Amino acid sequence: MTTLEIALLLMLPLVIFFQRSSWKMKEYVFLIPIIYVIWYLSYAFLHEICHLSAALMLGKKVYDFQLIPYFWKGELGVGYVKSEYNQLTVLMPYIKDVVFSVIGVSLITKKVIKKPLLTGLALTILVFSPLFDIANNYLVYVTQAINDFRAFSDLTSSAVAHFVGISFLAIPLISTLFLLMKAKNYPFGIYIKEKYGKQ
């Protein structure tokens, strides 16, 4: 995970959404680092549990796994699943990302969540994190490094891997842009904003 990707694909959309919302800055600014920490602690687990669950469901042999970084040992971004694999076990985290994006868009557009902390968590974990996850891993593949999309390419072909990577990336990207456009005065209407104002 790179700092620049996290800043551009995760934190920046969150800040923009909050700024366009009906909430005053004092209601959400202190929540941003809390949301980031919760995301950071859950990111590797959600990614690796998808690999592991797919391997177990398909009866693949699992040799070793680590679902979260060992923070107490100073590890900041280590997680892995070593197992027999196929196309589904390799792609499962990104299938999860696509599903999460659809769920996130539905929750936010229907205004099911109206509290800034829960809204921020839903946006970050369900929409912005999938954007980061797919973009980060696909771009690593494009630079010829070994990762999930490289394994998927070896199992299929380079053309198929690029098609899947771009197609999967498009969904959380479009979801993010759509929600940022819909963020104006969220979750309340213009009249509430005019009545109470923003500071």
Located regions from the model:
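Auxiliary, metal-adjacent structural segments of Zn-dependent hydrolase domains
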Residues: 1-29, 34-41
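Metalloprotease/metallohydrolase-associated module, dominated by Zn2+-dependent proteases
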Residues: 2-19, 74-197
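Small-residue-rich helix-interface/hinge motifs
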Residues: 36-86
